[in-house]
Amino acid sequence: MKGKRKTAQDALQHVYKITRDRGVLFYRKEDHIVYFTMQSVLSRRYRLRVLGTSHMYTHVHEGAFPEDIVQLSEYEHDLSSIFAKEYNREVGRSGSLFERPYGSAPKRSDKERRSCMVYIFNNPVEKKLVQRAQEDRWNFLAYYENDYPFSKRPFIRYSRKQLVDAIHLVEHEFRAGRYLGYKMLHRVFAELNAVEREQLTDFIIQLYFFFDRRACEDLFGSIPQMIKATELTTGKEFDVGEEFDPYSDVPYREMCAIVEKHGLMGAGMPFLHLPEERQMKLASFLMQHTGATPWQVARFLHREESRFR
């Protein structure tokens, strides 16, 4: 990701951002929602045309049409900086979160642009998290033609007061031009049942949805054709500086489920702050009960791999 950055006003920029220590970034819904709503607020503030994004466990992909290098750089700088502050407060850490500079590569022909967007959407498929791109929530592909792809649309008059209040609070924050922070999300999710949490998550994503559907239609012909393209090919990207990792991301999902089941995935991420002896026991347990390799456990716990060999 080193070297002079290339850009052009008519080029689709493929942006790639990974954590500095290559550790897991997105563990829970809250992590995705905070980052996604920041993307939404800041892309509108900078008037950046974003076609799509994909949140993976350790990194983020994004496809956007910037007016110039300054617009893209300022947007990415603010996004990384503001999210790092919010995330650091949540997990009790300090310092920058993402590797700098971020990776980017311009795509000037329509063929390159289509291949880039298909690659971004298909990241969860490549990492064996889903069979089809639209089955993954955090590449947001399903939301291009469906407001509630992972839940049933809530009807306010028949919904519990807790869900109605949560919806109104989210609407208020959206109208005020604010992203959703961890404290607010922890509070509202704690008052909802499992079905309502899914409904609220879908509501948040469709409300804050900021991707340029028109640009996607111009590129692929239509949204259904764009989705179909993700089923016909995986797309290819070689010039964005992405770390090569041939392994499945399923172990990360399995480890998240285990840690959550044991009550260690809540506010503050308690599992990251366990005493040394307990964390070593947790690492051993995770390796025994998932398909995780030692280096995946190390990335999950933000530790050196040599400690778990």
Regions found by a protein language model. Give the residues of each.
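Short Pro-Cys-Gly-centered "Cys-loop" motif that presents a nucleophilic cysteine in a tight turn
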Residues: 1-52, 66-309
